[in-house]
Amino acid sequence: MKITDVRIRLKDEEKLKGIASITIDECFVVHDIKVIEGRDGLFVSMPNKKNAEGAHKDIAHPIKTETRMELQATVLNAYKKALEEAKAE
């Protein structure tokens, strides 16, 4: 699996800092990946839906730890680049 494109929409909310869409292998897109500011810094939250009990359940997510780490690093790098570009404007 290769992430071939990342698009970031910057947000300036208390915890929500951005929303990403990624393209995998130039043929599959995942939207609404959130960039969140947590207690220990930035992290990526996969698209999710609230169930009947009020808990959030991921709609799509990596199964392997290595894949999750790669996805998070790629999205956070794109977020930081988008933030730098926005500050330069």
Language-model-detected regions and their locations in the chain:
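Single-stranded nucleic acid-binding surfaces, predominantly the OB-fold ssDNA-binding core
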Residues: 1-89
